A protein has these predicted regions:
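C-terminal outer-membrane beta-barrel translocator/porin domains of Gram-negative envelope proteins
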Residues: 174-199, 397-400, 416-418, 471-519, ...
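Predominantly the C-terminal beta-signal and adjacent terminal strand-loop region
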Residues: 628, 632-634, 709, 717-752
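Extended lipid/amphipathic-ligand handling interfaces
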Residues: 256-258, 262, 288-298, 671
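Transmembrane beta-strands of outer-membrane beta-barrel proteins
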Residues: 119-121, 271-273, 305-307, 443-447, ...
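Transmembrane beta-strand segments of Gram-negative outer membrane beta-barrel proteins
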Residues: 114-121, 392-444, 471, 588-596, ...
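Signal peptide processing junction and immediate N-terminal pro/mature segment
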Residues: 58-73
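Gram-negative/organellar outer-membrane beta-barrel architecture
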Residues: 105, 285, 303-372, 377, ...
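Structured extracytoplasmic
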Residues: 71-255, 276-280, 310-419, 521, ...
Length: 752
């Protein structure tokens, strides 16, 4: 879902006027928004944020600037924001767009600017992007490109440095040119992405005149404004933010926002997405582009930053995961009126230095130094899919914004197709996804458990509200719920162990019911608040196969019983990304849940806490991670509210799930380092935990005890194939045992 053309053609552009007003002689690049800047809060917050960003950058001293490579910016003496929201296609926005159209169509007319030279540096990230959970970097490339411009309109780019590193198995491929080089003039009159293989046939919102009636292509309206006053400049810069939407969303069109200079309509920033009809590749989910310009010498709007995001999925399968190619390029080291080679006009539009020179280029930062800054890891704002869908619905109505087919087969994980365990025996299933509109998605999953002879069904509808909040309605029949404190293994690993070794890493409950959930916030560094209510009927699974099918000498342990009945429950959960001392990043989750039996079974309140953090070297060849999981139950001693721990994923080096209780906590610290190559890693870990509050009847029925205090353990092992596969030896330090454990990277458990 991610290959690129090995020999792309260069992008095409059209001339754009550079401002000719006189002012200070220092560059003032405007602060670009992060990759998820399409998340739109209330107007006054957006206005304040834009003004604060402009002021913060203008007040900064010499040195590296966020999202820009610039030198010695001027200082701002003040800035103001005003509420200037207009109506669609009112007289004011039509006049502004006419100026912008004329500015774009004009030729370079400043006789004092004969040429410039600049350096473009950046990264191309290729990573796995699940709907929920951590991203996984597949490949990262770093480029350095000399940018040369000569009046009236000669643009040449030469790639002078290029290097890459593979972090997960992937075949070799080359990127399209607009992943490696700067797209000139904010794209041509026809917007193309990926040399026309991703997006094609889209009229540029600034290249078409403001038309009336049936000939109108886009609608425009002013949604925000900001004034920036620069030291040494008498007149302030007034910028207007214009929202753009297509008149006919079923045609290849763009949608998004433009930031324009009110004086002459010059483009300052452009953030665009596209309609589904714009996408050439049927694997495309969505594509967004951001182009930003900086003000140099108070008069020239020159390229500053470019971000292109291309998200793809398997066309006919909804796997709940996609891949993203994100390009982040920054332009700096400008030399105005520089002496350029006299034969520059005979150069190809894009050229490369020899291979040896590309490899030996002295990059200013390590290959992986920009992961947090560019929004791949850490605390950077991550685009919220709910907010993106909400923005698209507001601009497109009920026309889907995704390029994916509205109906696909749904396979959330490999074990949803086939699995094996001691309760269900052999299970076979398949699901489907239907997206009738941008605001609603329907998913179904059905299968059959052959050991008990029961169908297993699930249906889920989810959608978004006007302000990006999410909702979900779900129902299931004979769903398998686990009594473990945390999942013990990837489902596929559990199926293999049950099939070949007679080891089942589940303690299942047969659950049927309905659930409704509401999610507020979310996306990047903001708090995610989740409200949930449901009604469930719990039943015990009958003991299925007694022995492993491919090892008849090994018997399964018995299924642990719970009280059967119908239970109502409600919960409140808060999840938030967190910054930890020493540069660690991670997240925390707190959940409060109340449960009560509808037929007098009992009830109570449960609280749970989960913290995760990791620390990595710049080269990502050394890593330390820490996790804390805790849970407490207050109420009637229901078996269904006890949890199990011990062995893999909690306290390795002890028998699997030999402890239980209503209160428990587990702490783990693990470290890993490359053994000369990322293909092999040496791993080690320290673990500790305790469990208490075990009800005597539950202890007798389950054959478990509490831990009797803290139980520590250690582990040492080897990670293989970029740490995807892991073999660890573990030893419990208090009446424990030696264990050899096979596992896979937990980031992939939800896919297996």
């Amino acid at each position: 879902v991610s290959s690129e053309s090995p020999h792309p053609s260069p992008p095409r552009g059209s001339p754009r006027r550079i401002l000719g007003r006189r002012g200070t002689k220092n560059p003032v690049p405007l602060l670009p928004k992060p990759p998820s800047s399409r998340l739109r809060p209330a107007m006054f917050l957006r206005s304040l944020g834009l003004a604060a960003g402009l002021a913060a950058l203008a007040l900064a001293g010499p040195g590296p600037l966020p999202h820009a490579l610039a030198q010695t910016p001027s200082t701002a003496t003040g800035d103001t924001t005003t509420d200037t929201r207009g109506d669609w296609n009112d007289a004011r926005v039509r006049e502004l767009m006419a100026r912008a159209h004329a500015s774009r169509r004009g030729i370079i007319d400043d006789e004092e600017l004969r040429s410039y030279r600049a350096l473009t540096q950046g990264h191309i990230y290729f990573f796995v992007d699940p709907e929920e959970g951590e991203r996984s970097l597949i490949r990262v490339d770093q480029v350095a490109v000399d940018l040369l411009w000569k009046a009236p309109d000669i643009v040449r780019q030469q790639v002078v440095g290029e290097r890459s590193e593979v972090r997960l198995p992937v075949r070799d491929f080359r990127y399209y040119l607009d992943r490696l080089t700067l797209v000139q003039y904010g794209f041509g009159d026809e917007i193309q992405v990926g040399s026309g293989m991703d997006v094609a046939g889209v009229p540029h919102p600034l290249a078409v005149a403001t038309l009336e009636g049936e000939d109108r292509i886009y609608d425009y309206r002013i949604v925000d404004a900001v004034e920036l006053t620069l030291a040494g400049r008498a007149d302030p810069i007034r910028l207007l933010e214009v929202e753009v939407r297509p008149v006919d969303p079923q045609e290849p069109r763009a949608l998004g926002t433009l930031l324009l200079d009110e004086g002459d309509g010059s483009l300052v920033r452009m953030e665009l997405g596209f309609t589904a009809a714009s996408y050439v590749d049927r694997r495309t989910d969505r594509i967004t582009v951001e182009v930003d310009y900086g003000l140099w010498e108070g008069r020239y709007w020159l390229p500053n930053r470019q971000v292109i995001d291309v998200r793809r999925e398997v066309p006919d399968l909804d796997l709940g995961v996609g891949t993203v190619i994100r390009t982040v390029l920054r332009v700096g080291n400008y030399e105005l009126n520089a002496d350029l080679p006299p034969d520059i006009e005979f150069w190809p539009p894009v050229s490369w230095r020899p291979e040896a020179a590309l490899r030996n280029y002295p990059f200013e930062e390590p290959l992986l130094a920009g992961l947090e800054r560019d929004g791949i890891e850490g605390m950077e704002v991550r685009p919220d899919p709910r907010r993106l869908r909400s923005d698209a619905r507001r601009r497109l109505g009920q026309i889907p914004e995704s390029g994916l087919a509205p109906f696909r087969f749904h396979i959330p994980q490999a074990s949803s197709l086939v699995r094996y365990n001691r309760a269900e025996g052999l299970y076979l299933g398949l699901g489907s996804t239907l997206t009738p509109s941008p605001s609603v998605r329907l998913r179904t999953q059905g299968g059959f458990a052959f050991a008990p002879g029961r169908p297993v069904l699930a249906m889920e509808a989810d959608g978004i509200g006007e302000n990006g909040w999410g909702w979900r309605l779900a129902g299931n029949w004979n769903h398998q719920s686990d009594l473990g404190l945390v999942p013990a293994a990837a489902p596929l690993v559990g199926s293999l162990a049950a099939t070949f070794l007679g080891e089942d890493y589940l303690d299942p409950i047969r659950r049927s019911g309905v659930t409704a959930a509401l999610t507020l916030g979310g996306g990047g560094d903001r708090t995610d608040l989740r409200l949930e209510a449901g009604l469930h009927r719990d039943r015990n699974w009958a003991q299925g196969p007694g022995q492993a099918p491919l090892d008849r000498g090994r018997s399964f342990r018995p299924i642990r019983p719970v009280e059967e009945g119908t239970f109502a429950q409600g919960s409140l959960g808060v999840t938030r990304p967190m910054q930890f001392p020493g540069g660690g990043t991670g997240d925390g989750q707190v959940t409060i849940r109340t449960v009560w039996g509808m037929d007098g079974e009992g009830g109570g309140v449960a609280g749970s806490l989960r913290l995760r953090s990791s620390w990595s070297s710049l080269a990502r060849d050394r890593e330390v991670s820490a996790s804390l999981v805790g849970r407490a139950w207050a109420g009637d001693p229901l078996a269904r509210e006890h949890r199990l721990m011990g062995g893999r994923s909690t306290l390795p080096g002890y028998p699997f799930r030999e402890w239980g209780g209503q209160q428990m906590v587990v702490l783990g610290v693990e470290g890993a380092m490359d053994a000369g190559t990322p293909f092999f890693r040496i791993r080690g870990g320290l673990h500790a935990g305790m469990a208490g509050g075990l009800d005597p009847e539950v202890a007798s029925a389950w054959g478990v005890s509490d831990t009797g205090g803290i139980r520590p353990s250690v582990s040492l092992g080897l990670g293989m194939v970029w740490d995807l596969l892991r073999i660890d030896g573990a030893r419990g330090l208090r009446e424990g045992e030696w264990q050899l454990l096979f596992s896979v990277d937990p980031r992939w458990w939800d896919r297996l």
